[in-house]
């Protein structure tokens, strides 16, 4: 068996959270799903308050997981583009379910924004 697969949690929900379990990864997934291929700075602008280091780290993690494809063009200055792989595109129903749930939550009387995490 593949050693990477052996390290995944037995629970499929936990496996999914391991792969896209932080807010930055979900926002990267959202933007690449909505926009298609994007350059690093476009992605950074689209997400908003994400540092270059955090974006780089999360893109590498998602690339290693097979969710994001990184293409480097031999140009001066260098150009790098990111897009979703087929596996990344297969997460679109998960994103859509999150969108629907979020919209429904915002319609609830007394809906509260989440507390800021320390």
Where is each model-derived feature located?
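A basic, often C-terminal nucleic-acid-binding module that engages the phosphate backbone, implemented
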Residues: 69, 86-87, 92-93, 108-118
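Basic, amphipathic "hinge/linker" alpha-helix immediately C-terminal to the N-terminal HTH DNA-binding motif
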Residues: 74-98
């Amino acid at each position: 068996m593949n050693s990477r697969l052996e390290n995944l949690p037995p629970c499929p929900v936990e496996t999914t959270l391991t792969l896209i379990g932080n807010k930055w990864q979900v926002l990267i997934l959202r933007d690449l799903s909505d926009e298609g291929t994007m350059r690093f700075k476009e992605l950074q602008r689209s997400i908003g308050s994400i540092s270059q280091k955090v974006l780089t780290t999360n893109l590498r993690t998602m690339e290693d997981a097979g969710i994001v494809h990184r293409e480097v063009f031999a140009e001066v200055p260098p150009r790098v583009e990111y897009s979703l792989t087929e596996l990344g595109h297969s997460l679109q129903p998960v994103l859509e379910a999150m969108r629907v749930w979020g919209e429904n939550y915002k319609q609830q009387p007394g809906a509260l924004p989440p507390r800021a995490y320390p």
